[in-house]
């Protein structure tokens, strides 16, 4: 099927490189990669033409997701992340209510208070992110055959003893 590109030999080198980047991402987060097993559960290609856009969504069935830009022109749409929780919102509604800006309370929209974050990506870039992050692509762009390879990854404990919040090793699962 189209959701298992990682099983296609033509993509084996690319996916080996992506795996290295995923390991770096995990280490960057301070996670001991010796204690977990990492599974790529799905991987697929998306071709975008014209004004097509990907609506905001999450990959709730996995832990880590990625998008690798195999083909991308400067005019093609970028990936966008949507802030659902407004972690820096110290006053309720200050970042979402238009009157706060109109009334001069909020002086500017910036990286720390924006509802959406547009990540400028170029061809051969990869974006790795938590699967729970709400994301999509920009609208009103003229895509010229943008091709991205995306995938989902699951992290499982090698030894789940005394761990409440990790999935136990797959070899201990029982199919019902």
Name these PLM-found stretches.
Residues 31-43:
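A short coil-to-beta-strand element that immediately follows conserved catalytic motifs
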Residues 53, 132-136:
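Histidine-centered metal-chelating micro-motifs
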Residues 1-32, 46, 53, 78, 142-176, ...:
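Non-heme Fe(II)/2-oxoglutarate
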Residues 43-45, 66-68, 149-153:
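A structural signal for short, well-ordered beta-strand segments
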Residues 70, 133, 153-155:
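Short beta-strand segments enriched in hydrophobic/aromatic residues
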């Amino acid at each position: 099927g189209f959701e298992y590109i990682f099983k296609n030999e033509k993509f084996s080198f690319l996916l080996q490189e992506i795996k290295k980047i995923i390991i770096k991402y995990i280490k960057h987060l301070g996670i001991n990669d010796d204690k977990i097993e990492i599974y790529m559960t799905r991987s697929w290609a998306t071709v975008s033409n014209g004004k097509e856009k990907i609506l905001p969504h999450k990959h709730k069935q996995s832990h880590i997701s990625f998008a690798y830009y195999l083909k991308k022109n400067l005019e093609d749409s970028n990936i966008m992340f949507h802030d659902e929780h407004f972690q820096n919102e110290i006053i309720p509604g200050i970042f979402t209510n238009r009157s706060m800006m109109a009334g001069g309370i909020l002086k500017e929209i910036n990286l720390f208070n924006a509802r959406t974050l547009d990540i400028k990506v170029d061809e051969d870039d990869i974006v790795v992110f938590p699967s729970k992050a709400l994301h999509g692509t920009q609208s009103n762009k003229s895509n010229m055959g943008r091709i991205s390879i995306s995938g989902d990854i699951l992290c499982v404990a090698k030894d789940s003893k005394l761990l409440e919040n990790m999935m136990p090793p797959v070899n201990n699962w029982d199919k019902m």
